[in-house]
Amino acid sequence: MEAGATQKSLAATSLFAKVNNNGKFNRVNDISKDIKIKVLVLNARSIVKMEKRIELESYVKLHGYTIIAITESWTTPDISDNELGLDGFVLFRKDRSEIRVGKGGGVLLYVSNELRCVAVETLNAFKCESMWIELDDDSRANVIVGVCYKSPIVSEHELKEMFSAIRHAAKSRCLIVGDFNYPNIDWDSWECSNDDDEFVDLIQDNFFVSACESCYQRQ
């Protein structure tokens, strides 16, 4: 994912990449050069309505995205994958109901059918709102892509599950995107409140860097 594309496409979300660890990457942009992906990340606050999916599909075709990561999908088990489908994309989803009782939430990934990928069941088994896939790259080691959603109101157990999933993903080359609801972290200075320091430690200890320098919100 090129940095410019990242800045223009993110909507109040976060993107982290594993770089400078054992020589795997020299720059964040090396990831996109390896597997030629362009990622759109958004907090949809429901992708259930047909009108939203039609608008999303048009936007994706216009800008040539190959991976779409969505938080707050608001999907439920009574909505089939066929109803949520986008032309030319494979859908991977996890509804909130798979984790706990409650409305809203949920995450999903749309991956271009031109990319070879599989769901990472060991990571998807963690009881948190996250979805993980592995992109198959012929020339180098495969890349893990994950989307995470941390609700402003989240249990300690669910938060630990999410952090554990991220730690496991960090053993591989990976991109992690999502909405983590940590608005008080200063990514330039790493200053944060006591409530946020565990997440900052997680990012730093696993050699992630923030790949999002700016974002926009669309109503």
PLM-predicted stretches and their roles:
Residues M1-Q219:
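A shared catalytic/ligand-binding motif for oxyanion handling
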